[in-house]
A protein has these predicted regions:
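Conserved N-terminal helical subregion
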Residues: 1-6, 23-25, 48-184, 227-244, ...
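Glycine-rich FAD pyrophosphate-binding loop
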Residues: 23-42
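Flavin-dependent oxidoreductases
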Residues: 179-211
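Residues at the starts of beta-strands that form the adenosine-phosphate
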Residues: 5, 28, 217
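N-terminal Rossmann-fold NAD(P) dinucleotide-binding loop
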Residues: 15-16
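FAD/FMN-dependent oxidoreductases across multiple families
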Residues: 213, 225-288
């Protein structure tokens, strides 16, 4: 692959991970990300089974482990905070309810970016506006006005992929909703979490708190059933209103956690969904 010019759309997890392997094989890689910088926040990512081997082969085992949440375990509670069930991180050889290697999405993104930033070109605050491909390459027009030519273009821009819509068609054709919405955001650690995750469930909904590497803060977690997201995934204010509506009347610490919703720096909400496609490439354009 020496000398092949590859454009990757998306600088979260999949994009920088792909860039790592492409660069190792000699490709010239550019990653474009519409956000002005790496996006913080998001859920915890558990590395299990083959994922541990992939991390090792990338030479990132030490970096990933250093950024782990160091969660000791989890327990479920009733409305009064009484413990119902306890799960330890070392259960089942470290692959139980809490994985031995557990890292926040934003921290994993930072590890992958730091690993590739010196050998990969990153363009933040821009996006692919138009592309035209022929037998020899792909001409790309960026929203910022730049025009460049690449040998391959790969979409790693997630559930709401703009590249997928541009090349394959509208998202409604491919996205299958699985009936659940998740939300995450950091809050001040005023709950004495120490190293334990707490989970409370009520009427098909859940609320929880988990420790994060910054011991002064904690991660709030919510889930609720929904046939669709119901709001624009880019409209954060509407997403926060939706979360408040769906969590209304829920017991335990839920009202207290929701008081921090407006001042959190890293709110994230999205539906749980699956992308189903007959093919993942079209000429010189592919998707992860």
């Amino acid at each position: 692959m020496s000398g092949i010019r590859v454009l990757v759309a998306g600088a979260s997890i999949a994009g920088p991970a792909l860039a790592h392997w492409l660069r190792r094989r000699g490709a010239e890689v550019t990653v474009v990300e519409r956000a002005p910088e790496l996006r913080p926040g998001g859920q915890a990512v558990d590395a299990r089974g083959v994922a541990k081997e992939v991390i090792r082969r990338m030479g990132l085992d030490a970096a990933v482990r250093a950024a782990c949440t160091d969660t000791a375990g989890a327990y479920t509670v009733d409305v009064d905070g009484n413990v119902l069930e306890t799960y330890r991180a070392d259960d089942n050889g470290g692959d139980g309810y809490i994985s031995e290697i557990e890292i926040l999405r934003g921290d994993l993104s930072r590890v992958l970016y730091d690993d590739t930033r010196d050998s990969v070109e990153y363009i933040f605050g821009d996006r692919i506006a138009e592309l035209t491909q022929d037998a020899d390459g792909v001409d790309v027009a960026f929203a910022g006005g730049d025009r460049r030519r690449f040998d391959l273009v790969v979409g790693a821009d997630g559930l709401h992929s703009a590249l997928r819509a541009m090349v394959f068609g509208p998202r409604e054709r491919f996205v299958r909703h699985l009936g659940l919405v998740l939300a995450f955001y950091s809050v001040p650690n005023e709950f004495e979490l120490d190293r334990w995750l707490i989970d409370y469930q009520e009427s098909g909904r859940s609320a929880g708190l988990r420790p994060i590497p910054d011991a002064t803060r904690a991660m709030a977690m919510f889930s609720f059933p929904a046939a669709d997201l119901e709001v624009d995934y880019r409209d954060v204010a509407a997403q926060k209103r939706l979360l408040r509506e769906r969590m209304a009347g829920m017991g335990w610490l839920t009202p207290r956690i929701l008081t921090h919703l407006d001042d959190t720096p890293d709110f994230y909400l999205d539906q749980v969904a699956q992308v189903v496609m007959d093919r993942w490439s079209n000429g010189r354009v592919g998707l992860l």
